């Protein structure tokens, strides 16, 4: 039996460091940032969900289901993950941010391999130096635990997953895979890298 894996692209933040611009819609090399992310993950999953708390109509134009946080008040990535976990019947949910246009083309395969090798409930990606808390593969059944954590006032994803059996998938062979865009300067650097990838 093959596993069903869906994905959620997190585009629900305030993007304060980008001057409030909606990061997923910022143009990079002629395409919205989220389009680069979609291109990277679409071949790896069955369904894609987009978590957005503004510009929902614009995000819907990409042809995927758009979900706004069930917990209001821009509570961070956990809120978007909880919402997506409640809208999938998949065995696993891939979580990625909207502003990582160089995500690995084998992201799901390696995260799943880490889960299976470690009998884990979830796997988090690492660039070899640090874990990337918003790049993970997890079981949607963890929604209840994550909801309780968020409703207790907690926000840090790594604090949440530390309470569970988690594995780390290291992508040391792709050191720039998780480079994201938080400032206009980073956007310029990334545009050059995309041209080379």
From Swiss-Prot:
GO terms for biological process: bis(molybdopterin guanine dinucleotide)molybdenum biosynthetic process. Its EC number is 2.7.7.77. Its cofactor is Mg(2+). GTP binds at residues 10-12, 23, 51, 69, 99. The keyword Cell membrane does not apply. Signal peptide: none annotated. It catalyses: Mo-molybdopterin + GTP + H(+) = Mo-molybdopterin guanine dinucleotide + diphosphate. It is found in: Cytoplasm. Pfam families: NTP_transf_3. One of its GO terms (cellular component) is cytoplasm. Mg(2+) binds at residue 99. Keywords: Cytoplasm, GTP-binding, Magnesium, Metal-binding, Molybdenum cofactor biosynthesis, Nucleotide-binding, Transferase. The keyword Magnesium applies. Monomer. Transfers a GMP moiety from GTP to Mo-molybdopterin (Mo-MPT) cofactor (Moco or molybdenum cofactor) to form Mo-molybdopterin guanine dinucleotide (Mo-MGD) cofactor. Belongs to the MobA family. This is Molybdenum cofactor guanylyltransferase. It comes from Shewanella sp. (strain MR-7). The gene is mobA.
């Amino acid at each position: 039996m093959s596993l069903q894996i869906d994905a959620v692209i997190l585009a629900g933040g305030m993007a304060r460091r980008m001057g409030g611009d909606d990061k997923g819609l910022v143009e990079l090399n002629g395409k919205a940032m989220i389009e680069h992310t979609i291109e990277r993950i679409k071949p790896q999953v069955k369904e894609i969900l987009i978590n957005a708390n503004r510009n929902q109509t614009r995000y819907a134009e990409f042809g995927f289901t758009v979900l706004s946080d069930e917990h209001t008040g821009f509570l961070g990535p956990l809120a978007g993950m909880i919402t997506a976990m409640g809208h999938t019947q998949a065995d696993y949910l891939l979580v990625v941010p909207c502003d990582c246009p160089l995500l690995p083309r084998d992201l799901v395969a390696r995260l799943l391999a880490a889960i299976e090798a470690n009998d884990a409930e979830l796997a988090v990606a690492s660039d070899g130096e640090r874990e990337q808390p918003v790049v993970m593969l997890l079981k949607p059944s963890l929604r209840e635990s994550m909801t309780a954590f968020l409703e207790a006032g907690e926000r840090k994803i790594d604090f949440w997953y530390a309470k569970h059996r988690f594995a780390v998938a290291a992508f040391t062979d792709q050191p720039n895979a998780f480079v994201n865009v938080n400032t206009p300067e980073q956007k310029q650097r990334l545009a050059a890298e995309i041209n080379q990838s």
